[in-house]
């Protein structure tokens, strides 16, 4: 039980949750588990269909239709159900989690405001090409002036959210990991084989096709006595396209697309792999890269993404300015065993600061601020009402 904060009942609202797999779903599960361990009562509210009994916290799956491809709600029904839940369960805080387009989350944030509930919103995406649309919406509806604490999962994501509205501040509520779940005992590796691994949602923005297209050149420049293999874990709308690309490039047997894997299976895959690579250049955080770094893998990714907040070039991994440099960094680690092992040794023996223990403390601080903000807003509204009395 958390002795510093009275137990809170917290609504964690998101368009998506498990069994769908991605950074936002993994984050939501980790947050709910961490809050439960700290003695609080989180409730996940989502439109994603699935079981409600597989978790140590309540999961409310709304009985509403969603689009097949992206899982978006498109009727008023979910908001009627959410309003009833918010009223019946008397939440202390409502914490909404958004991507770029999150109709359930945005509508729920409005409901929390209308019901006078303390509210926090966390943005899990980089609004690089979309912040202007949010700014127009703010001019129309003034969402950034609501009594809500706005946050993002990294400074990279926060910078674009700040441009999208007129809020006083955007707080940072980062992703996190349980390091001990990823740091498995070292396994004996084949010195003649280099195993590359990536974990991502197979969407266009994640750029799995870019990674696969690098493989022919990597194979051409690979030492003659060394075999190369790439595993891309994940599922999504681009999987058929990636499978066709693998066949067209003749990479069957070199590239494996196993789909969604359980985290324990991914941890075992990390333990026997040599390099983790994440080609996305608009990554809001990159929790899979943090998990791989915690497992002891050198991480290769794009320097313009949020990886730069927890991967230092030459220390935890290598960061590229463009796709050509991404390929060069991979080749350097494929050829240079000592550099690769040096980074891996650092990652295995140096704990990351991005743990759920510290993240939960930060969340609780922001929840307390949200309750204060709600009280301040209500006090100002009461003063205005009294000022208008005859």
Regions found by a protein language model. Give the residues of each.
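Carbohydrate-associated surface elements
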Residues: 48, 156, 176
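Short alpha-helical donor nucleotide-sugar binding micro-motif in glycosyltransferases
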Residues: 260-261, 268-273
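Short hydrophobic beta-strand element within catalytic cores of glycosyltransferases
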Residues: 298-301
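Nucleotide-activated donor-binding/catalytic signature segment of Leloir-type glycosyltransferases, i.e.
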Residues: 241-261
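Aromatic "clamp/platform" in nucleotide-sugar-dependent glycosyltransferases that forms part
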Residues: 281
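A short, well-ordered alpha-helix in the C-terminal region of glycosyltransferases
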Residues: 339-353, 362-365
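Conserved donor-binding/catalytic core segment of Leloir-type glycosyltransferases
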Residues: 188-216, 231
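Conserved acidic donor-binding segment of nucleotide-sugar-dependent glycosyltransferases
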Residues: 313-324, 332-337
């Amino acid at each position: 039980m958390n002795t510093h904060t009275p137990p809170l009942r917290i609504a964690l609202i998101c368009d998506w949750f498990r069994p769908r797999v991605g950074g936002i779903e993994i984050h939501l599960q980790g947050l709910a588990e961490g809050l439960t361990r700290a003695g609080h009562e989180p409730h996940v509210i989502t439109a994603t269909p699935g079981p409600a009994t597989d978790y140590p916290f309540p999961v409310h799956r709304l009985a509403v239709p969603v689009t097949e491809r992206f899982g978006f709600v498109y009727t008023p029904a979910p908001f009627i159900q959410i309003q009833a839940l918010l009223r019946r369960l008397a939440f202390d805080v409502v914490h909404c989690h958004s991507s770029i387009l999150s109709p359930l989350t945005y509508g729920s944030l409005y409901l929390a405001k209308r019901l006078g509930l303390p509210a926090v919103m966390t943005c899990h995406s980089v609004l690089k090409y979309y912040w202007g649309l949010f700014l127009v919406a703010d001019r129309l509806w003034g969402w950034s002036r609501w009594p809500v604490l706005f946050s993002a999962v990294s400074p990279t994501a926060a910078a674009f959210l700040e441009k999208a509205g007129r809020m006083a501040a955007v707080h940072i509520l980062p992703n996190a990991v349980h390091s001990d779940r990823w740091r498995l005992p070292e396994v004996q590796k084949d010195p003649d084989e280099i195993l590359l691994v990536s974990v991502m949602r197979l969407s266009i923005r994640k750029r799995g096709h870019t990674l696969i297209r690098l493989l022919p050149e990597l194979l051409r420049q690979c030492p003659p006595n060394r075999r190369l293999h790439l595993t891309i874990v994940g599922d999504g709308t681009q999987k058929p396209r990636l499978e066709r690309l693998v066949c067209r490039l003749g990479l069957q047997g070199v590239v494996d697309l196993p789909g969604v894997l359980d985290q324990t299976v991914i941890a075992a895959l990390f333990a026997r792999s040599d390099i983790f690579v994440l080609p996305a250049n608009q990554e809001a955080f990159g929790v899979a890269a943090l998990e791989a770094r915690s497992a002891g893998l050198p991480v290769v990714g794009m320097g313009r993404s949020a990886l730069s907040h927890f991967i230092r070039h030459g220390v935890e991994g290598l960061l590229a300015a463009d796709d050509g440099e991404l390929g060069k960094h991979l080749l350097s680690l494929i050829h240079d065993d000592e550099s690769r092992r040096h980074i891996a040794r650092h990652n295995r023996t140096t704990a990351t600061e991005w743990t759920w223990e510290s993240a939960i403390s930060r969340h609780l601080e922001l929840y307390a601020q949200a309750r204060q903000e709600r009280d301040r807003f209500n006090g100002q509204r009461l003063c205005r009402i009294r000022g208008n009395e005859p």
